[in-house]
Amino acid sequence: MILAIDVGNTNLVLALGSEAGSVDSVWRISTDAVTSADACSKAIRKTLGTKLEEVDNSVIASVVPAITRHVATAMEGVTGRAPLVVGESGVDLGIAVNIDRPEQAGADRVVNAVGAQVHHQLPAVILDFGTATTLDLVGADGAYEGGIIAPGVALSIEALERAAAQLPKLELRAFGDDLPVLGKNTVAAMESGVFWGYVSMIEGLLARLRSADAPASADMPAIVTGGLAPLFARHLAGAVMVDQDLTVKGLLAIFARNTEARHDEGNDG
């Protein structure tokens, strides 16, 4: 099986899956733990345990260039094969990137677009709750058309705590539908600002994207992914679906595409 690794600013998401796109198991490792290839290898071996025996190949997407090579070196040591790294020369993503400087597109955002292209109805908006909150448009033809980057929920909470000395530390939790908009104490007011503030921001951005000219469309669905997807998705208007494995599915699709291409080249030879 393939180990798909999404290297983010906060966590490494590791998922065991097949080239057909099925996902077997998912784990997380703190990005801070990846201080070297050796540290990464130890963390992966400890986290996967006996499941590591099922790993034949690996594919990596990273938005943290400083540790990409650590992860790649670790996986080559684990599998005996060099991993496929999104963004490296010769890797075919199978998707057009229609932005001003395609080489600057975040690997995770393009991989999400591939996942949507392969597994979902298009056009669509991808809403990803990570260190940043991103909204990205994938056109009806499967092309990545650009998007929006806003501060992530946890990042906003941290900034509020740092800048306002009298505000308490706010624990991000599973807010219920009955969370009042009008807070009657400091914590309740902060919770409302974070939760309903983000719901309103996302609804507003989705509405603007859906009302934009082609390649957008008024009825296009929002595909919601990332750790906070279930918390916010149920409050969003229009067609909304949660796909927690979207990035992993995109990585598996890219691996399958490039494996097939190498196989075809071998047959031609």
Sequence positions of predicted segments:
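Glycine-rich beta-strand-to-loop/alpha-helix junction loops that act as flexible
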Residues: N57-P65, F129-T131, M220-A229
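Short glycine-rich, Thr/Ser-proximal phosphate-binding strand/loop in the N-terminal lobe
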Residues: I2-K46, T50-L52, A143-Q166, A188
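Phosphate/pyrophosphate-binding loops at sites that engage ATP/ADP/AMP, CoA/4′-phosphopantetheine
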Residues: A43-N57, V78, L205-M220
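Phosphate-binding/catalytic loop of phosphoryl-transfer enzymes
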Residues: R81-A163, F195-R208, D268
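Short glycine-aspartate micro-motif
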Residues: I2-D6, V59, A124-D128, T134, ...
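Residue-level signal for inorganic ion chemistry
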Residues: L14, I60, G130, L160, ...
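Glycine-rich phosphate-binding loop and adjoining helix at the ATP-binding site
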Residues: A39, V63-H120, L236-A256
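ATP-binding/phosphotransfer module of carbohydrate and carboxylate kinases, centering on a glycine-rich
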Residues: M1-A4, T31, T35, S156-G269
